[in-house]
Amino acid sequence: EGHPEVVTNIEGTKASPEFLQAIAYEVYVKNVTFGLLHQWLTDMGMTISKNTLRNWLKKGKTYLDELVCVLKSIALEKDSIVNCDETWCKVRKYDHYKKCYIWVLVNKAQKTAIFFYENGSRGRDVLTDFLGDAELKSIMSDGYNAYVFIGNELKSGRFKDTVHQVCMSHAKNKFVKASNQGGEPTAERFSEILKEFFMRDRKYDDAGLTPKERFQERQSLETKELLIELRSLLDSEQSKDSEFRSRYYREALNYLNRFWKEIFAYLDDGELPIDNNLAERTIRKLTTQRNNSLHYGSDAGAEMAATYHSVIGTVKLHGSSIWNFIGTFFKNIF
């Protein structure tokens, strides 16, 4: 009593847990660039370099990496249902900025989001390296990742029991674009039928159906009739001369045909999702940062962002306060 409060510094730095909490929140939640953050701190009278700020966040990353390792093992538990997506970012390599990619994998049931980065690549090795020997029930992606990933890896013995899904929203949006921009009248009917699948699943959500009940509805006569109508329309359109069709319509038809099995795999299981919106919403934060001209000065900077966003994304899925979690974490590691 009567003594000043003891300020604990993070080992190897002069930063307190509270200060690290503040700069991490500014950079990775509020999307403030290092340059603006540095300017703000110097305007307040602090003598600090941008490199020092990065080094402090790097120190915080070493502790968060241990947490992310645990979260990853939870996200990839046996028979998990996961969604994945990627987005591009700018990373400085060899004195210039290069377009690179950060990925995210989300496990809805476990409320876990893991961001990962492997030298900025968008290739199949990034995903397969991340998955390791995980025995997943299903993995959902968009069409590009399906093209790159499903071609070999998911058809191999390594992932033979994993159901690969492709997002239905992407298929529907392609037909909407073909109708609005390509002027293709039949494209509207495709989008209407695909929309009906979404409406049905939304009704199941509103009714609070169990996976077993949802499976029964997905296998109903009405659903099968809708599927037959869509397939008949697709076969009919593909049999016609495509010379005078818009490229948007050709792309939509080819997409639906190529990924038909993966798009409608959800009908065979009451637990599987219909789209990849969960992963897309989770990674949208990085898209916002990119639009704010955020860039990473190195691969290490992108890897650090992946660590912080893994924690932030997971906390958001739990509906908890990011500010409070980060602060409590850094205060309790000492």
Please report, for each region that a protein language model flagged, where it lies by residue:
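Catalytic center-proximal scaffold of phosphoryl-transfer enzymes
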Residues: 2-334
